Structures are given as structure tokens and as C-alpha cells.
Amino acid sequence: MRFGKIEYLNLLPFDVFLKGYRTSNSFKSTCNYKKSYPAKLNKEFLFRRIDAGFISSIAGMNAHYKAKACKAGIIAYKEVWSVLVLESSPASDYQSATSNALCLVLDLKGAVLIGDRALKYHYDSKHTNSKSSHFQNSTLKHNKPSKYYDMAKCWYDKTGLPFVFGRACFHTNDTFYKNLIQDFNHKLGQGKRYKGVKIPHYILMPYVKKIGITKTFATKYLEHIYYKIEAKEHHALTLFYRYLRIKGIKAPKRF
């Protein structure tokens, strides 16, 4: 079994859960091997180089309608901090298909920035006096954070719904992956903000240092993210897919 994971801070609770989950060591090692950014995992999934994984919501559209998607994803309500559109020349982010599509759905103009790079950008914008503010990106030719939009907030303003940025989908081993995600949801507990998965200091700190943020900021960021897909999140996905059809935006394909 080959499971792919998005290598961002927002999936750290799942990583911690998986470490203590009763399954084979070979499966766990495969999960650590198949880690990358969303757009790369989309290709891995579409070409069946992985059996399952957390992939972009737009790439999971077929899985959504074919009952090949689990009830867990990477979800934000009102704010996300790590999916931004910067006031700059229009530019897509090579790491994400969903966020690029969402930018078009929301009629936003600017440069799309996602993941830990976007989180660092947001952090720097809130700490403009910090000496560590030295964001660099090939899309943007300046270091000083400019005005930007949080796409989860823009989506909420438009629909009143949360947004599902990524989703756990599978090709094979349906029962195993459904049980895995069901156990993950059960471990998390009830409510958006409550997480039954406690992240140890020694696991969190390497991410904090790598991104260039504080532990407090990282903890607050994770409070903006939740994972369980229920009726409202399912409706948000269906609405997003409807907007894609209206806008003529195609989901990623193998060829």
C-alpha cells in the first residue's frame, strides 16, 4: 500500500496520529517516503503511483462522485493563513491546483501563494519589525509583505461555508483507508477546534524552525485547521465543484 501525504505543517496532527496507529511499519515508512506538495501528489495519484493520499480537492473531484473519498480533508473556516492571494502580478502557484482554481472562482487578481511559504508570509506581515522577515519567492521580487487576501475568508464571505483544500482519497484497499480515516476522526474528537491528537514539542519544533515562525504562532495556525468532513463540508465541496463547471475550470488529468 502506498499512501501520499502533503508535506505541510497543517497535516502534522495526522503524522502524529499515524505514528501511534496500529498498522504495519512498511505502511508507515511508505507514508514518510511519499510526501510532497499537493500538485505533485495529484499527479502521483492520477498515475496510480500511490494508492491513496491527501490530495488537492480539485484532483479528488472524481473520487468525490465515485465514493472513493474519505470523510477527512484539510479544512479551514473563515481563515486559513496559509492560502493567500497577494496584490501583485497575476501568477499561479505551481504547488497547488485547488488554490489556483479557487482564485479564479473568487475572481481574485494577484499571485497565489500556499503552504508553509504562505504561512511564513502571513507571519512576517504580522511581525514587520522582526529581523527575520526575509521572505523570498520567485514570483515576487520584493521582501516586504504587501497586501494580500486570505482565500478561506474570501470563500466564507461568498458562501458562508468552510473550504476543503485537500481530501483523503483512494483507488484501492477501500476498507483499510476508510477505517484509518474513521479512527483518525474519532481520535480528533468533536468540534472544529478540539484535537485529541497532541503534538509533542520535539515534533513541532523542527517545523517551526524550518518555516521561521514561533511555536505560539504555529499552534494558533493549527487551531484554524480541522479535518472531519461532515454535511456542511460536503456541501462546500459540491458547491466548489459546481463553480468549477460554471467557470469551465477543468480538474487535473493524466494526459
Language model features by range: what are they?
Residues 1-255:
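Domain-level signature for soluble enzymes in the chorismate/prephenate branch of the shikimate pathway
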